[in-house]
From Swiss-Prot:
Function as written in the Swiss-Prot or TrEMBL entry: Mediates an immune response in larvae. DIF binds to the kappa-B consensus sequence 5'-GGRNNYYCC-3', located in the enhancer region of the immunity gene CECA1. Involved in the melanization immune response to bacterial challenge, possibly by acting in a Toll signaling pathway that down-regulates Spn27A in response to infection. Part of a signaling pathway involving NF-kappa-B (rel) and Toll-related receptors, that functions in the apoptosis of unfit cells during cell competition. May be part of a NF-kappa-B and Tollo signaling cascade that regulates development of the peripheral nervous system.
Cross-referenced InterPro entries: Dif, Ig-like_fold, Ig_E-set, IPT_dom, NFkB/Dor, p53-like_TF_DNA-bd_sf, RHD_CS, RHD_dimer
Domain of life: Eukaryota
Higher taxonomy: Eukaryota, Metazoa, Ecdysozoa, Arthropoda, Hexapoda
Broad class of the protein's primary localization: cytoplasm
In-chain residues carrying the UniProt-annotated modification Phosphoserine: S343
SUPFAM superfamilies: E set domains, p53-like transcription factors
Name of this protein: Dorsal-related immunity factor Dif
GO BP: any one term: immune response
Record's keyword terms, sorted: Activator, Cytoplasm, DNA-binding, Nucleus, Phosphoprotein, Transcription, Transcription regulation
Motif Nuclear localization signal per UniProt: ranges: 364-368
Species for this entry: Drosophila melanogaster (Fruit fly)
Gene name linked to the record: Dif
Domain RHD: 78-372
């Protein structure tokens, strides 16, 4: 029926154009569903449909003249007039996927007191049947077809392809859109909706469909209703001028940011943040970071990185912060972020956000600043008298000594002039200059090197390779360990190892307390002479300075005793191995034959040692009150350390002793 009506309207338009000679520039009405017609039949938007009085029945003219209209029409010919505009309030555009009706479009005068009203139009100056076509167009001129659809549950047959069409009988002059609502097309469905309108040639204002390829520029939440009418003139249908309603605003759910898990991030970006919000579409939402100047102009912006799958139930977004325009900032920068809906450009209220410097770059920056500060301070001090290079003292009450240099050359052998024949092997090596002093024989060491007082030396015939395991000399105790052969009896100062010992230590031999000093010494097996524990100067022949590691006196007698006892060792003990026997130390002291001169250097270098030696010497030279009876072997042993022995007198004494025993000596 609608197609037949459209054919009648086209015939009416063509006939009127022939009568008027094409003055009106007629054409076909674009917008009738399924209508044919040549493409050159186009009506201008400002041209009303020609209504020929000869074509209008007389009773219709009288009816129009006598009918009382609510508002008199300013136009004399048939036309459409809007009685009730759609509401200016925001309404909800329903999606098809919601599974419910889109509701209805309230009118401008709708209220709780007066009741609900709906958009209403009226056909003026025409009493015949009228076909009304309603579609959605954009809110801005030129009025192009809008992709949203008009739908109705009760009048499903009247709503096809997103448009609403209805035929008004002659007794009805008004059309009320009471059960018609607006269905929101998805972003992916918008182009298909416009292609369907283009196919059916629904374009009241002949604005073309070029916008079907620019979906992003279409405001999804604002549109208008376009009313178009077709009247019957005789056997023809004539279209009336289309009109549009006031804009209808859809409820584009207000974008609101409820909460952010963090309001700061590094300048490098990439920090993950979760935002809580209200009712967002995962395919139509952006999180925008931006910065403004003092005048409020936007100087920088960047969108956060997230996918539609990062939107959780239209209530939360997990996104990554974008990189700030300057990643080498040294101070925090305050920016703002907001939600943006690309389809309609709606935005949320902005929230403050902070970009802070990267920790690695901040550390490097602080170091550079500190280095520059120090250099600047140095340059400032150079121009003053506080710089160290300018603080030179011309005089001082303290004497400046140079740091002693450590000798790096090979030590050279230096021998005292008084000791050229006392070293059959080599001479001791030392670096420092030595004092002039008398030489003496050193029987403590087996080599020509200077032995240390911190080591003890094994017997010449002992199998010991070292005696490092022997406990060091202890100067704080009054005990001495003495080990003597059975057939020997001589005066000594020190401890001696067993002649038949094959061990590396003498700790296993039972000690015996015999004296006031504590030294470990080892007597050669075939020697019978008094010896001293160790040379206080570490080597024989002279020294630079005696060594005192324990800060105690390391010698038992004075220097004269050392020299005299060593130079008087001329006796040879009998051959053979003897058993070990513990005896009492002989207290008789014999004066040496040779008394060397005192060494002033030692006295000056170590006055405490000399003083201690002077205190010890009188005590050692005092003879004891009780002297034990000497045997024949003791008599022979007691001759050690005396002047050269008169052999003839000794032989006479031996013969006299043998005669007294009744033994005839052999001659």
């Amino acid at each position: 029926m609608f197609e037949e009506a459209f054919g009648d309207i086209q015939e009416i338009i063509n006939a009127s154009m022939e009568l008027n000679g094409g003055a009106t520039g007629g054409g076909s009405v674009a917008g009738a569903v399924g209508g044919g017609g040549a493409a050159h039949h186009i009506l201008s938007q400002s041209t009303s449909l020609p209504v020929m009085p000869s074509h209008i029945p007389l009773h219709l003219q009288n009816q129009n003249m006598n009918q009382n209209l609510p508002e008199p029409s300013a136009r004399s010919g048939p036309h459409l007039r809007i009685v009730e505009e759609p509401t200016s309030n925001i309404i909800r555009f329903r999606y098809k996927c919601e599974g419910r009706t889109a509701g209805s479009i309230p009118g401008m005068n709708s209220s709780s007191e007066t009741g609900k009203t709906f958009p209403t139009i009226e056909v003026c100056n025409y009493d015949g049947p009228v076909i009304i076509v309603v579609s959605c167009v954009t809110s801005d001129e030129p009025f192009r077809q809008h992709p949203h659809w008009l739908v109705s549950k009760e009048e499903a047959d009247a709503c096809k392809s997103g448009i609403y069409q209805k035929k008004l009988p002659p007794e009805e002059r008004r059309l009320v859109l009471q059960k018609v609502g607006i269905q929101c097309a998805k972003k992916l469905e918008m182009r298909d909706s416009l292609v369907e309108r283009e196919r059916r040639n629904i374009d009241p204002f002949n604005a073309k469909f070029d916008h079907k390829d620019q979906i992003d520029k279409i405001n999804r939440y604002e549109l208008r209703l376009c009313y178009q009418a077709f009247i019957t003139v005789g056997n023809s249908k004539v279209p009336l001028d289309p009109i549009v309603s006031s804009p209808i605003y859809g409820k584009s759910s207000e974008l609101t940011i409820t909460r952010l898990c963090s309001c700061a991030a590094t300048a490098n970006g990439g920090d993950e943040i979760i935002m809580l919000c209200e009712k967002i579409a995962k395919d139509d939402i952006e999180v925008r970071f931006y910065e403004t100047d003092k005048d409020g102009r936007e100087t920088w912006f960047a969108n956060a990185e997230f996918q539609p799958t990062d939107v959780f139930k239209q209530m939360a977004i997990a996104f990554k912060t974008p990189r700030y325009r300057n990643t080498e900032i040294t101070q925090s920068v305050n920016v703002e972020l907001k939600l943006v809906r690309p389809s309609d450009g709606a935005t949320s209220a902005p929230l403050p956000f902070e970009y802070y410097p990267n920790p690695e770059l901040l550390t490097k920056h602080n170091r550079r600043v500190a280095q520059k500060t120090v250099e600047s301070l140095k340059r400032s001090l150079m121009s003053t008298n506080l710089h160290p290079s300018k603080q030179v003292k011309t005089s001082s009450q303290y004497t400046i000594f140079s740091k002693p240099q450590i000798a790096t050359t090979t030590p050279q052998t230096q021998v005292s002039p008084g000791m050229p024949l006392m070293f059959p092997g080599g001479s001791p090596n030392f670096v420092q200059d030595i004092k002039m002093e008398n030489g003496f024989m050193d029987v403590d060491s087996q080599s020509s090197q200077c032995p240390s007082v911190e080591r003890n030396f094994a017997s010449p015939r002992s199998n010991c390779s070292t005696v490092d395991s022997i406990p060091p000399m202890q100067m704080g105790q009054n005990q001495t360990h003495l080990y003597l052969p059975d057939a020997t009896n001589f005066t000594f100062n020190g401890n001696f190892a067993s002649p038949s010992s094959n061990c590396s230590t003498v700790d296993s031999i039972p000690p015996f307390q015999i004296g006031q000093r504590n030294n470990h010494m080892y007597l050669p097996e075939n020697s019978n002479f008094p010896v001293n524990g160790c040379s206080p100067t570490h080597f024989s022949g002279g020294s630079m300075t005696p060594i005192n590691n324990n800060n105690n006196v390391l010698i038992n007698n004075n220097n004269n005793d050392f020299l005299s006892q060593k130079m008087s060792a001329i006796s040879i003990p009998p051959q053979g191995n003897f058993g070990i026997k513990q005896v009492y130390q002989q207290t008789q002291q014999f004066l040496p034959q040779l008394q060397p001169e005192s060494i002033p250097y030692l006295a000056q270098s170590h006055p405490e040692q000399s003083q201690y030696q002077q205190q010890q010497q009188p005590q050692e030279q005092q003879p004891p009150a009780d002297e034990p009876t000497q045997s024949f072997s003791d008599l022979i042993s007691s001759s050690i350390g005396m002047a050269p022995i008169d052999t003839s007198e000794l032989i006479q004494d031996i013969e006299a002793e043998l005669n007294s025993l009744g033994i005839q000596p052999f001659k």
